[in-house]
Amino acid sequence: MAQPRCWYAHGHWIQGHGCRVIPSLAFVHIPINATDTLQAQAGDRPNYQPGINDEVPVCQQSQGWCRDGRYDWDKPECRYGGHDELFMRALASTPGVMGLFYGHNHGNTWCYRWDTLLPGMAVEGNGINLCFGQRTGHGGYGNWIRGAREIVVTRDKLKDFSVDTYMCLESGATVGAVSLNATFNRDWYPATPNDETETQT
């Protein structure tokens, strides 16, 4: 199997910025393996990682793929093929990346700070915050309330590589407000309600 090329790992986007650490955020559709491992290890901590945690385990990148590139969900050794390891290494080795944001799992809306080597993983986290969004559209599965994760970026907070984020729901409510900073995972927050809406036909 050909080795995947990770455009992110090459760092060409840093050139021309005086080689200083640039605060940044990353966005993908499907969560990385560290998300599934954090969920399994930490469990449900609604006052430290507020959000809905209804989809266990996380549907993640490389799910159902064998290491040799074959898709075979029925083989236990192919439940996770490791094809996102290069991307995780690039994220964990890039200074200034404050958060990775994704969706895909409609029933998960939490964030978690990945700052250790997790059991069964070959990549050690560097303090990047991993965050789900909120179910946004009227298609797809589930009856979780629709909304959006909003990310508030200010110059003052960027000096400390910190951003604020919360969910703005279709009901008008704001839930899950947290500061993604050096003490996230240890700071206490109100739990997020698990609200649902009727599916429109």
What are these regions (language model features)?
Residues 1-109:
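His/acidic metal-ligating clusters that form di-metal
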